[in-house]
Amino acid sequence: MDYFTLLGMPNRFDIDKQQLASRYQEMQRQYHPDRFAGKSDKEQVQAISFASTINQAYQTLKNPLSRAEYMLSLQGIDIANEQQTMHDTAFLMEQLTLREELDDIEHSTDAENLLADFSARLEKMYTVRYDEMVKTLDSQTWDIAADNVRKLRFLAKLKEQVEHLEERLFDGF
């Protein structure tokens, strides 16, 4: 049973996050291992296993990128564990340029302003790519969706690096 079915959600990218959280909490209460304390060892182990599966399903579906990766995995495209390299050289060059720019910002005397501008540009790039990913998932153009997810992973990692740099530069103020 796939995670969407398990949690009673439609198998599509755009899901109701409140409904997802409610369904998760309801299932966690219903299948909590403590409710099986007086049952046989086998039933207790099954309850623990099922509660773990429910938790994994929720964690996967609540995060947009992991949800997209999961949807692709249901189509036989395993992005999460792939070793495939990116073939879009223009995108890779852009990523290298952005990383170099971020390194330069770290050592700049105007780091705060430069980082704010960089972060805004990066957020715009992420939003454009995210919107494209949603369209390709909705239209079930799986290969293009997979390419968008791969690129979003690069951008998400860069956003994390920006957050870490902000912490290093500005937490002392």
UniProtKB/Swiss-Prot annotation:
CDD domains cross-referenced by the UniProt entry: DnaJ (cd06257)
Pfam families assigned to the protein according to its UniProt record, in alphabetical order: DnaJ, HSCB_C
Presence of the UniProt keyword Chaperone in the record: yes
Protein keywords: Chaperone
Domain J: 2-74
One Gene Ontology term from the biological process aspect of the record: protein folding
Annotated function: Co-chaperone involved in the maturation of iron-sulfur cluster-containing proteins. Seems to help targeting proteins to be folded toward HscA.
Family as reported in the entry's similarity comment: Belongs to the HscB family.
UniProt-recorded name of the protein: Co-chaperone protein HscB
Gene that specifies this protein: hscB
